[in-house]
Amino acid sequence: MTEPNKPLNQMTAQERLDLGRSYFKEGKLDEAIAVLKTISTSEDPTIYALSQRLLGDIYGCMGKLNEATAAWSKVRCEDNPETYAWAQFSLGNTYKTIGKLGEDIAAWSNIRREHSCEAYAVAQYSLGNTHKTMDQLDDAIAAWSNIRRDDDPEAYAWAQLSLGDAYRTMDQSDNAIAAWSSIRRDDDPNAYAWAQSRLGFAYQTQNKLDEAITAWSNIRREDEPELYAEAQRNLALVNKH
């Protein structure tokens, strides 16, 4: 149980942030909010940014989305670029949840690679997905293509899978195959399995059965059990002919 060892007005901003975090971890949300609200930007802009991000997260857990978006919106890039990036990502997710599609795009678009590579990658992935749902395929492709493996391997893998799917709908099979082929198991085993499954069918359509067999054979049970079973069925059917 967390108990402050001195009055709040005698604690530094960092100590109050730590106390707020401890309350949050213990599920004492009201106590966490009360402590975090005492931190001002004039005391320490960096810690203020961290406190507002945490406040937003707490309000989000409580379902108080208006309060959450208000807190995240107070995080300024110049105070703490990485915290700003994640606050903007959370804003985008919340705006999407409540149906503010233009505002989610704006929030995610505020995130730059230099703020946080990982936040940038997941924001670009989310942007791509949103543009896709709006039938803006060119914009979706542009967003997914912005993600590098060294930003975030998992986001890169799923972006490449989505790119391949987009190219397939545009009848650009070579581009689709290139995108799916770029995914490695160590990026994300599940995305890798889906990519190999798609590659198998793409090669089968092109009557490149050796390549199809290789792709399906690459899928392991631990990657994705259902895709593994499907790949084994496909291999059995191909080997019959």
Positions of predicted regions on the chain:
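Start-of-helix register in tetratricopeptide repeats
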Residues: 14, 46-50, 86, 122, ...
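TPR-adjacent "capping" and linker segments in tetratricopeptide-repeat scaffold/adaptor proteins
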Residues: 1-15, 43-46, 79
